[in-house]
Amino acid sequence: MGAAGLLGVFLALVAPGVLGISCGSPPPILNGRISYYSTPIAVGTVIRYSCSGTFRLIGEKSLLCITKDKVDGTWDKPAPKCEYFNKYSSCPEPIVPGGYKIRGSTPYRHGDSVTFACKTNFSMNGNKSVWCQANNMWGPTRLPTCVSVFPLECPALPMIHNGHHTSENVGSIAPGLSVTYSCESGYLLVGEKIINCLSSGKWSAVPPTCEEARCKSLGRFPNGKVKEPPILRVGVTANFFCDEGYRLQGPPSSRCVIAGQGVAWTKMPVCEEIFCPSPPPILNGRHIGNSLANVSYGSIVTYTCDPDPEEGVNFILIGESTLRCTVDSQKTGTWSGPAPRCELSTSAVQCPHPQILRGRMVSGQKDRYTYNDTVIFACMFGFTLKGSKQIRCNAQGTWEPSAPVCEKECQAPPNILNGQKEDRHMVRFDPGTSIKYSCNPGYVLVGEESIQCTSEGVWTPPVPQCKVAACEATGRQLLTKPQHQFVRPDVNSSCGEGYKLSGSVYQECQGTIPWFMEIRLCKEITCPPPPVIYNGAHTGSSLEDFPYGTTVTYTCNPGPERGVEFSLIGESTIRCTSNDQERGTWSGPAPLCKLSLLAVQCSHVHIANGYKISGKEAPYFYNDTVTFKCYSGFTLKGSSQIRCKADNTWDPEIPVCEKETCQHVRQSLQELPAGSRVELVNTSCQDGYQLTGHAYQMCQDAENGIWFKKIPLCKVIHCHPPPVIVNGKHTGMMAENFLYGNEVSYECDQGFYLLGEKKLQCRSDSKGHGSWSGPSPQCLRSPPVTRCPNPEVKHGYKLNKTHSAYSHNDIVYVDCNPGFIMNGSRVIRCHTDNTWVPGVPTCIKKAFIGCPPPPKTPNGNHTGGNIARFSPGMSILYSCDQGYLLVGEALLLCTHEGTWSQPAPHCKEVNCSSPADMDGIQKGLEPRKMYQYGAVVTLECEDGYMLEGSPQSQCQSDHQWNPPLAVCRSRSLAPVLCGIAAGLILLTFLIVITLYVISKHRARNYYTDTSQKEAFHLEAREVYSVDPYNPAS
């Protein structure tokens, strides 16, 4: 609740005379609203004003209903007003002499308020708050005043000539107030502008004076003159004029005005030089003179035409050859006339109609082309212009430059797998553009490094490929993946049976940028120990891990007694297999060994003077047990627990309860009364105890009366502390008591070895006293001899000679079997502590690396075209197209190293040529034709020719025909040749027969060999020779 509200409550409670007095409706305001109120409006009611969105409230926003005469109600202050917001409104700093601001700060915008308070010893008249109005004035009331409460006042200030002050027509002035002086127009204030009334009743300074203000003479005006009035008082005007060739820039006159605390001339003009624009250029000509952009007034330029451009063509100047820079009516520089022109004087020159393929003419189309005519070309969509798009008809009747050509733009060059192209983010690929390819580390480029865009819009040669590079190992291997170097991942690896992928090693490979190849490792699959079964055992060892494929066989233990056996339930053999989990698993659950029993049943059991304390009731089956206890006064004789055996009897026999013979009368006695009857119970002690004497227990019964039992007394046997040895210690150093059976172990300090028994035990001697089992050992200094054991590397081998033991600094070189990778150092050394440093390495099985797809060979194929993954051991077979010969191994095998066993073969084109002499050949061969490898031809001769040789031949890999091509011989030589041939055949036959008869005659052995390899067949034919011109022959 505000102060006004509190006042209203106060009036309502304290001044009951105001009850029933009310105020009229609050004054309305434009563009505003009044808070809700109810009628009648009682004294003490507060109403609030607010303005619409774009209006500002000027004045107090709340009014209070009060009464001054206790008769009528009235509002305590006038209503505020709402002014439309003026964003440009700005009020000056408000000053209240004798007061100060308590709220409000600069700048003062429309609607801002300032609240004042008076200084000490001053009181306020007027409203303490004022608002900045749209008219840049403070309102809605005048600024408040602060009146001094001191009795001393300053006297009234005198008037000054040609000036005024803020306290004119005012009497004395209260201390703390100030007076401001100002001069009339044309005068300057000399002295203090503001003087203050002091508390002493005196002014802080003497009143100032107002002196007439005058401007200084303007002096010389560059490139012109100025006309000044005789007296340069405030308000006079000076006029400016420019020399010829200059023009006035700025106002033509300047005025003497007051400026701050002095006087000055208003802005003065300058005389700027008049310039003409650059002389207009002319086609086929030039001008002599100033060629700058701004040419001075009065300058002259002279025009001339260019030299003859070519033979038969010259230029003629038409118009005035000289121009002068002058001014127009607007004082703007201009040339005295238009520029001349140079026109050609040509003979009859005519150029042919220009042509362009895959393009068109976009301008300059004519039926006839003469000297200097130009045409502009553009290409069809998808083609690029090569050359100048504009050509000109010259004086020789030809086009220059020559007509362009339209070439097709290439598509973006393709990306390659495992590589990149250097296209510099180009979006357009014109003919002639070259793109360079490169491969990522670990890959090698196959094909040309660069391709080029041809005018047909295609790339040539074919785009290269990035094939997997062979790793040239540097010998460096990392067990963790490198973070900032290229690693070629292994995605094709697999492990053999009994192994699974587990971890990787990274082999560094040589290259322009060293890179790494991931090698997957195989971990042997192992199973946990096979389950242990009750009443049975398995053939497995006591290993913690069992290798994959291990089989164990279960058997049952022998029967616990005769007639009882254990039967194996389940599979007797289980095998270590693999699953998708981290470890191997057994192929099945372990079997069970269950008892195989006949119908066993023992008789009902009962003892006199006793009772059963545990066990079931009858009937009793195998291994059922019963436990007995005797009644008080009876002693159990026999075993307290019996068991039902397989033979239907109890084991041991059923006990009996016998009446106790000794009824205890008193506590044990150390001395036996004379004449007493004694019964010995036990005269010795258990192991670990020493007999120290006897005691006597008094007994009494009806038959014997009083008698005594002799009872032995036993104490625990102790040993003295074991001996301390030099350069060593034993495990009982911190113990105080050593009982019978306790054991201590000795060990020596570093550099000493133990001589004697390592362990001693507390025992008893012949007299029953405690003693150690032997003498204490000794610690002797160790001789400087080093013996390292023979290092065993599973899946590996030693490169140097093997010994049973190794001495200090002996070095062993080890390596892993093929298919395994080493984890550790290949070189180990025998250390003085009989160990190998840096430790015996291990060999980890490498994963089977899948081979990459085998390379294709031009003009051939292989059998692996539809196979996605090539595992170790897989093979492919290459073959060539018809007419091509396979060069290299046809069969390639994928190795465990992930490479192919041989380089891929290639297909070599093999051709056989036709013979140079083809006379008489009618069919089978064509002149100058090349025949592919394997081709078979069958020859036929023309009439009058005879075939000599085999009619069929085949093209071989050495480019030769096999058998050699036959020839066609003219039949005119046939009779002679046939006769010679017949004679040679007959002569050969006779020689063979003669040699055969001679050899048989000498050997006197005749036999027949039926072997097809050595058999021969002779057939004699009659040869006819026919002369077509002599039928009689």
UniProtKB/Swiss-Prot annotation:
Tissues expressing the protein: Mature B-lymphocytes, T-lymphocytes, pharyngeal epithelial cells, astrocytes and follicular dendritic cells of the spleen.
Glycosylated position list: N121, N127, N294, N372, N492, N623, N682, N800, N823, N861, N911
Disorder this protein is connected to according to its UniProt record: Systemic lupus erythematosus 9: A chronic, relapsing, inflammatory, and often febrile multisystemic disorder of connective tissue, characterized principally by involvement of the skin, joints, kidneys and serosal membranes. It is of unknown etiology, but is thought to represent a failure of the regulatory mechanisms of the autoimmune system. The disease is marked by a wide range of system dysfunctions, an elevated erythrocyte sedimentation rate, and the formation of LE cells in the blood or bone marrow.
Keyword Nuclease: no
GO molecular function: complement binding; complement receptor activity; DNA binding; immunoglobulin receptor binding; protein homodimerization activity; transmembrane signaling receptor activity; virus receptor activity
SMART domains associated with the record: CCP
Record-annotated membrane-spanning stretches: 972-999
Designated name of the protein: Complement receptor type 2
Domain Sushi residues, every copy: 21-84, 89-148, 152-212, 213-273, 274-344, 349-408, 409-468, 469-524, 525-595, 600-659, 660-716, 717-781, 786-845, 849-909, 910-970
Matching SUPFAM superfamilies: Complement control module/SCR domain (SSF57535)
UniProt keyword annotation of 4Fe-4S present: no
Protein purpose: Serves as a receptor for various ligands including complement component CD3d, HNRNPU OR IFNA1. When C3d is bound to antigens, attaches to C3d on B-cell surface and thereby facilitates the recognition and uptake of antigens by B-cells. This interaction enhances B-cell activation and subsequent immune responses. Forms a complex with several partners on the surface of B-cells including CD19, FCRL5 and CD81, to form the B-cell coreceptor complex that plays a crucial role in B-cell activation and signaling.
Topology of the protein relative to the lipid bilayer: Single-pass type I membrane protein
UniProt xrefs under InterPro entries: SEZ6_CSMD_C4BPB_Regulators, Sushi/SCR/CCP_sf, Sushi_SCR_CCP_dom
Substitution effect: D112A: Reduced affinity for C3
Keywords: Cell membrane, Complement pathway, Disulfide bond, Glycoprotein, Host cell receptor for virus entry, Host-virus interaction, Immunity, Innate immunity, Membrane, Receptor, Repeat, Signal, Sushi, Systemic lupus erythematosus, Transmembrane, Transmembrane helix
Family stated for the protein in its record: Belongs to the receptors of complement activation (RCA) family.
Annotated S-S bridges: C23-C65, C51-C82, C91-C132, C118-C146, C154-C197, C183-C210, C215-C256, C242-C271, C276-C325, C305-C342, C351-C393, C379-C406, C410-C453, C439-C466, C471-C509, C495-C522, C527-C576, C556-C593, C602-C644, C630-C657, C662-C699, C685-C714, C719-C762, C748-C779, C788-C830, C816-C843, C851-C894, C880-C907, C912-C955, C941-C968
Chief localization: membrane
Chain ranges on the Extracellular side, renumbered to this chain: 21-971
Ranges in the topological domain labelled Cytoplasmic: 1000-1033
One example of a Gene Ontology biological process annotation: immune response
